Curated annotation (Swiss-Prot):
This is Ribonucleoside-diphosphate reductase subunit alpha. Under complex allosteric control mediated by deoxynucleoside triphosphates and ATP binding. The type of nucleotide bound at the specificity site determines substrate preference. It seems probable that ATP makes the enzyme reduce CDP and UDP, dGTP favors ADP reduction and dTTP favors GDP reduction. Substrate binds at T442, S457, C458, G486, N670, L671, C672, T673, E674, P857, T858, A859, T860, I861. It comes from Chlamydia trachomatis serovar D (strain ATCC VR-885 / DSM 19411 / UW-3/Cx). Tetramer of two alpha and two beta subunits.
Length: 1047
C-alpha cells in the first residue's frame, strides 16, 4: 500500500515537467532489466526469488527517493536511475547492474553521435563541415530536371525530398565510425543514388547518375588542360527581376552582400555559412524576392544557435524595406538624404496614402526629417522588423511606404496634433518611441497620423434588457471592432431562460442566443482587414443562465448554444467566495426578478441578495435555482481547465477600489481583463493604452528613477492627447472618454528586467522589485496627471471622485479590508516613497484622468521591441514563434549570454534544450543558481506570480492581464490558486495555461539518440528516424500572437 507521503512526491521528467512519483515504473524497469540479463521471455513468470529481489530493490529505491524529496531536494529520472544502479550492486546483482550501466552508457554515447560532428572530404582534399542542405539542394535539382519543373518546387516534391534527405543522413551516420567522423563526397553521392532507387525514384536516380558522369568528364577535361576545379565561389544562378529581366548572381556576390549584413557580429556570425545555406535553395530562374527570402530564412534558421543572427535577419529585411519604400538599398551612400527626401514627399502626398491631410501643413517637415536617427534601426531584431513589415507599416497597392523611423515619426506626429508647439513635441515623442522606452498600443500604432485616427484600445459596454438596446450594442460592437478596438460586454441584465416576456406573454430564451449573435458579429467584422473582431462577454455568477454560459466554449453539445470565437468571463461577487468557504448554497436568479442586484456591491449587494433569497423562500420569486456553491465552483474550474474559459474576475475589489464610485458601477472588464471602468446605457467606457519598457530603465542593480519619471511624464501626455485626437465610432464612446479621460499606462519586459538584475521570478527579490517598480510608476503617473490637470484642467467628472476625496490607490486597500475582514484580504500595504508631495499635488491641482494604470498583455508590441510580454514569466527558453511570415525558433538571449560566459553554449546544449522542451532543470551541465534564475512559467509556483501581482495591485488603480500557470493542474490546486488570487486582492485574472499547451519543435532532434524507442531494445528500431511532431495545443489564448485590440 502506498503511503500518503509517497503519493505527494513529484519527480522531474526528461521534458522538464514535474510528475507524480510512481513506484510501479521502477518495478517495471527492474523487471525488464532482469528479463533481459537472465534471458527470461516476457510470457514466462519470473522465479519467486527474482521477483522478491525486484520488490526489495524497488522498496529501497522508493524509500531513498521519498527521503530526498522530503528533505527538499529535486529528484530527476536520471537520479533515480543512479539509485537503481547503486542498489543493484549493493544487493549483489552485478550482472544486472553491469548490463544496466552498459545500456545507459550507450545512450550517452548516442548523444555525441550526430551529423553535426561529421566532416566531408572534398575532391580537392579540403575538409568541410557536413551540410544536409547540400543533399536537399542536389535532390531538388535532380527532381526539377526530371519533372521539368518551372518556378517554385511543388510542396509534395519538397516533402519527398525531406524524407529522402533524412534517410540519407541516417545512412551517412551509420557509415561513419565514432573515431573518424569524416566521409568522402563520392561516398555521399553513392548513398544518394542508392536511396533514390530504394524508394522507387528510378528516373530521378538515372538523371542523377548521368549528371555525376557529366561532371566527372568535365573534371577530367580540366585536369588535361591543367586547370583546377571551380571553387564553390564561382557557382552562379540566373535571377529573374521584378521587371522580367534576368541577371546572373554568383556565390561570391551573395557572400559579399551577406558579409555586410554580418559585419556587426564578426565573432558570432558566419556569412559563408549563410551563403551556402541560401545558395542550396536556389534554382535557375529564381525570382529576386525568393533570393532575398532564402537569405533571410538562412539567417533565421541559425537564430536558435546564435541570437545575433536575429539582427542579421533584421538587417536583411531592413534592406528589403528600404528598397521597397525608398527605392534604395540600406547600404547606399546617400541613404540619409534619400530618407529625408522620401519622408517629406510621403507626408506631402499623404492624401493618397490615407494620412491625416493636416500633417503636411502643421509640422516643420525639414526639422522632423533631420530629427530621425537611422542608427536606431539597429535596435530591432528580426521579429520586430517582421511584425512592423507584416502589420504596421502603411502601404499602398502592396508597397510599403514607411521605414521604421518614418513609422515612429508618423505615430509621433499624430499624437502631437493638439500641441501648441507641434514640431517640438513630435520630436520629443519620436525620441521616446524610437528608443524603445515606451510603446503605445496597437490601435495607436495602426492609426496615429492616419485619416481615421481611432487610437483607443478598449471599450466596455453594458446591455439593457430590451431588444432595441441588445441590437444597438451588437451594432456598436461591429463599429468599434471595425477600427481595431477590443470589446468587453456586460450581459448580466438580460432576463434568463423561462422568464416572462410581458409584451407577448411568451417566455424568454435567455442570454445565450444573443451571445451567439455577438460571436458571429465579431467574426464577420474584421479589424481593418488585419484580424477578426475580439469580444469578451461577462456574466455575473448569480444569473440563472450562468451554468449554460459556462459551456459556451465547449466543442460538444448544441451548436446553436455555443460561441467558439468570443471570450467569456465570470463576474464574481465576494459573497460567492464566502458561501464557498462556508460550504453553503448559492441561488441563481433571473435579473428581472432581482432589480438593483447587478448594480450593487459590497455590503449593499449582500443585503439585497439575502433579501431576494428570502423572497424565494416565501414564494415571491418563482424562477430560480439553488445549487451548492462548491458544485458550481467545481464546474467553473472544470470549464476553465477544459476550454480556457471563463476567466475569473472579481466584482467587489473592482468597485470598492474604483476612483469613480461616485459616477456609477464597474459592471465588467474589457477583452483582456485589465480595464475596470464604469459603463451604462448612455456611456461606453473607453481606455487608451501604452506600456513602459522596464528593461530600458535598468541601470546597474536597479531602476533609473529619473529616466523613468521622464518617460512616464511624456507617456501620460501622449495618452492624454489620444483622447482629444481620437476618432470615435459611437456617440456613447466619445461622451464617456471626454467626460472621464481614462488612460491605461502599463509595463512590459518585467522578466527581462529580472534577468538583468540576476533575480529569479520565484523569489522574494522579484516580489520586492514588482512592488518597488509599481510604486514608482504609480507615483510618477499620478504626478504627471496632476501637472497636466494644472496645465489643461481636471477631467469633468472629477468632483466627488476618490481623488477629490483625498484617496489614492494605496488608500483604498483599507476600504476593501473593512468590507472583507482581515482573514479574506492578505495584501501588503508598505511603501518606500514619501507620498505627501503627491497628495498635496492632487489636492491643489486635481487629476486629468479618472483612472491611470492598467497592465495589458502587450503580445504584439513587446515583439516589436524585443522584450518579454507584459509581466509574464518566460514561457520556454526555446520556443517556436509564429507570425504572418511563418515559424522559427527563438532562444532566450539572456540565458545564452550566461551559458557563453561559462563556456557551455554548444550544439549539445541546444539539443538538450530542445529535448527538455526549453527547460533547464534536468540539464546537468547548468549550475543550480542559473536554473533558479531561469525557471520557466510552469516551474514557478503560482504563489510567486500571484504575490508579485498583489504587490502591483496595491499601486495601480485598474487591473492587470494576469495569466496563471500550472504544470499539471488538479481541482484542489486550481481552487487554491484562484482563492489565493482573490484573497491577495487581485481584481481580475486572465488565461489559465497548462503545460500541455505547446512543446518545442523537435524536427532536428534525433529521437533514437534520446531512447524514445522501447526501453530495452538493443537494436535501432525502424521508427527511430521519424520526426517528432509538436503536441496539439490545449486551449490557450487565441490572441497569443498579437492581441491587437489591447496592445
Amino acid at each position: 500500500m502506498v503511503d500518503l507521503q509517497e503519493k505527494q512526491c513529484t519527480i522531474v521528467k526528461r521534458n522538464g515537467m514535474f510528475v507524480p512519483f510512481d513506484r510501479n515504473r521502477i518495478f517495471q524497469a527492474l523487471e525488464a532489466a532482469f528479463r533481459d540479463t537472465r534471458r527470461i521471455d516476457d510470457h514466462m513468470p519470473l522465479p519467486e526469488d527474482l521477483e522478491s529481489s525486484i520488490r526489495s530493490i524497488t522498496h529501497q529505491v522508493v524509500k531513498e527517493v521519498v527521503q530526498k524529496i522530503t528533505d527538499g531536494q529535486v529528484v530527476t529520472v536520471e537520479r533515480i536511475q543512479d539509485m537503481v544502479e547503486s542498489q543493484l550492486y549493493v544487493n549483489g546483482l552485478q550482472d544486472v547492474a553491469r548490463d544496466y550501466i552498459v545500456y545507459r552508457d550507450d545512450r550517452k554515447a548516442h548523444r555525441k553521435k550526430s551529423w553535426q560532428s561529421l566532416s566531408v572530404v572534398r575532391r580537392c582534399g579540403t575538409v568541410v563541415h557536413f551540410n544536409p542542405m547540400k543533399i536537399s539542394a542536389a535532390l531538388e535539382k535532380a527532381f526539377r530536371a526530371t519533372d521539368k519543373t518551372e518556378g517554385m518546387t511543388p510542396s509534395s516534391v519538397r516533402e519527398e525530398i525531406n524524407a529522402l534527405t533524412q534517410n540519407i543522413v541516417a545512412e551517412i551516420e551509420e557509415c561513419c565510425p565514432q573515431q573518424d567522423r569524416r566521409i568522402d563526397i563520392e561516398k555521399i553521392q553513392d548513398i544518394v543514388e542508392q536511396q533514390l532507387m530504394v524508394v522507387g525514384h528510378y528516373a530521378v536516380a538515372k538523371n542523377y547518375i548521368l549528371y555525376r558522369e557529366a561532371r566527372a568528364r568535365v573534371r577530367d577535361n580540366r585536369e588535361e588542360d591543367g586547370s583546377t576545379e571551380k571553387t564553390i565561389a564561382e557557382e552562379a544562378v540566373e535571377v529573374l527581376s521584378k521587371d522580367g529581366s534576368t541577371y546572373t548572381m554568383t556565390h561570391s556576390q551573395l557572400l559579399a552582400h551577406l558579409a555586410r549584413a554580418c559585419s556587426r557580429f564578426p565573432e558570432t556570425t558566419d556569412a559563408a555559412l549563410l551563403t551556402d545555406m541560401a545558395f542550396a535553395n536556389f534554382y535557375s530562374g529564381i525570382k529576386e524576392s525568393e533570393v532575398v527570402l532564402a537569405c533571410i530564412m538562412a539567417a533565421r534558421a541559425n537564430i536558435e544557435k546564435e541570437p545575433d543572427y536575429a539582427f542579421v535577419a533584421a538587417e536583411l529585411l531592413l534592406d528589403v524595406v528600404y528598397k521597397e519604400a525608398l527605392g534604395k538599398s540600406k547600404y547606399a551612400e546617400d541613404l540619409e538624404q534619400a530618407h529625408r527626401d522620401h519622408f517629406k514627399r510621403y507626408i506631402a502626398e499623404g492624401d493618397t496614402y490615407r494620412l491625416n491631410a493636416e500633417l503636411k501643413h502643421l509640422f516643420d517637415l525639414d526639422a522632423l526629417a533631420d530629427a530621425m536617427d537611422l542608427s536606431r534601426d539597429l535596435q530591432f531584431s528580426y521579429m520586430g522588423i517582421q511584425n512592423l513589415y507584416d502589420r504596421y507599416f502603411n502601404h499602398h497597392e502592396g508597397c510599403r511606404l514607411e521605414t521604421p523611423q518614418i513609422f515612429w515619426m508618423r505615430v509621433a506626429m499624430g499624437l502631437a496634433l493638439n500641441e501648441q508647439d507641434k514640431t517640438s513635441w513630435a520630436i520629443t515623442f519620436y525620441n521616446l518611441l524610437s528608443t524603445f522606452r515606451y510603446t503605445p498600443a496597437t490601435p495607436t500604432l495602426f492609426n496615429s497620423g492616419m485619416r481615421h485616427s481611432q487610437l483607443s484600445s478598449c471599450y466596455l459596454s453594458t446591455v439593457q434588457d430590451n431588444l432595441v438596446n441588445i441590437y444597438k450594442v451588437i451594432a456598436d460592437n461591429a463599429m468599434l471592432s471595425k477600427w481595431a478596438g477590443g470589446i468587453g460586454n456586460d450581459w448580466t441584465a438580460i432576463r434568463a431562460t423561462g422568464a416572462l416576456i410581458k409584451g407577448t406573454n411568451g417566455r424568454s430564451q435567455g442570454v445565450i442566443p444573443f451571445i451567439k449573435v455577438t460571436n458571429d458579429t465579431a467574426v464577420a467584422v474584421n479589424q481593418g482587414g488585419k484580424r477578426k473582431g475580439a469580444v469578451c462577454v461577462y456574466l455575473e455568477v448569480w444569473h440563472l443562465d450562468y451554468e449554460d454560459f459556462l459551456e459556451l466554449r465547449k466543442n460538444t453539445g448544441d451548436e446553436r448554444r455555443r460561441a467558439h470565437d468570443v471570450n467569456i468571463a465570470s463576474w464574481i461577487p465576494d459573497l460567492f467566495f464566502k458561501r464557498l468557504q462556508q460550504k453553503g448554497t448559492w441561488t441563481l436568479f433571473s435579473p428581472d426578478d432581482v432589480p438593483g442586484l447587478h448594480d450593487a456591491y459590497g455590503e449593499e449587494f449582500e443585503r439585497l441578495y439575502e433579501e431576494y433569497e428570502r423572497k424565494v423562500d416565501t414564494g415571491e420569486i418563482r424562477l430560480f435555482k439553488k445549487v451548492e456553491a462548491e458544485d458550481l465552483w467545481r464546474k467553473m474550474l472544470s470549464m476553465l481547465f477544459e476550454t480556457g474559459h471563463p476567466w475569473m474576475t472579481f466584482k467587489d475589489p473592482s468597485n470598492i477600489r474604483s476612483a469613480q464610485d461616485h459616477k456609477g458601477v464597474v459592471r465588467c472588464s474589457n477583452l483582456c481583463t485589465e480595464i475596470l471602468l464604469n459603463c451604462s446605457e448612455t456611456e461606453t467606457a473607453v481606455c487608451n493604452l501604452g506600456s513602459i519598457n522596464l528593461v530600458q530603465h535598468i541601470v546597474g542593480d536597479g531602476l533609473d528613477e529619473e529616466k523613468l519619471s521622464e518617460t512616464i511624464s511624456i507617456a501620460v501626455r501622449m495618452l492624454d492627447n489620444v483622447i482629444d485626437i481620437n476618432f470615435y465610432p459611437t456617440k456613447e464612446a466619445k461622451e464617456a472618454n471626454f467626460a472621464h479621460r481614462a488612460i491605461g499606462l502599463g509595463v512590459m519586459g518585467f522578466q527581462d528586467a529580472l534577468y538583468k538584475l540576476d533575480i529569479s521570478y520565484a523569489s522574494q527579490e522579484a516580489v520586492e522589485f514588482a512592488d518597488y517598480s509599481s510604486e514608482l510608476i504609480s507615483y510618477y503617473a499620478i504626478q504627471a496627471s496632476c501637472l497636466l490637470a494644472k496645465e489643461r484642467g481636471t477631467y469633468s467628472s472629477y468632483k466627488g471622485s476618490k481623488w477629490d476625496r483625498g484617496l489614492l490607490p494605496i488608500d483604498t486597500i483599507q476600504l476593501l479590508a473593512n468590507y472583507r475582514g482581515e482573514a479574506n484580504l492578505q495584501m501588503d500595504t508598505s511603501s518606500r516613497k514619501d507620498w505627501e508631495p503627491i497628495r498635496s499635488l492632487v489636492k491643489e491641482h486635481g487629476m486629468r484622468h479618472c483612472q491611470l494604470m492598467a497592465i495589458a498583455p502587450t503580445a504584439t508590441i513587446s515583439n516589436i521591441i524585443g522584450v518579454t510580454q507584459s509581466i509574464e514569466p518566460t514561457y520556454k527558453h526555446l520556443f517556436v514563434k509564429s507570425n504572418l511570415s511563418g515559424e522559427f525558433t527563438i532562444p532566450n538571449v539572456y540565458l545564452i549570454e550566461k551559458l557563453k560566459k561559462l563556456g557551455i553554449w554548444d550544439a549539445d546544449m541546444l539539443d538538450d534544450l530542445k529535448y527538455f522542451d526549453g527547460s533547464l532543470l534536468e540539464i546537468e551541465r547548468i549550475p543550480d543558481h542559473l536554473k533558479h534564475i531561469f525557471l520557466t512559467a510552469f516551474e514557478i509556483e503560482p504563489e510567486w506570480i500571484i504575490e508579485c501581482a498583489s504587490r502591483r495591485q496595491k499601486w495601480i488603480d485598474m487591473g492587470q492581464s494576469l495569466n496563471l500557470y500550472l504544470a499539471q493542474p488538479d481541482g484542489k490546486k486550481l481552487s487554491n490558486m484562484y482563492l489565493t488570487a482573490w484573497k491577495k486582492g487581485l481584481k481580475t485574472t486572465y488565461y489559465l495555461r497548462s503545460s500541455s499547451a505547446t512543446t518545442v519543435e523537435k524536427s532536428f532532434v534525433d529521437i533514437n539518440k534520446r531512447g524514445i524507442q522501447p526501453r530495452w531494445m538493443k537494436n535501432k528500431s525502424a521508427s527511430a528516424g521519424i520526426i517528432v511532431e509538436r503536441a496539439k495545443k490545449a486551449p490557450v489564448c487565441s490572441l497569443e500572437e498579437g492581441c491587437e485590440a489591447c496592445q
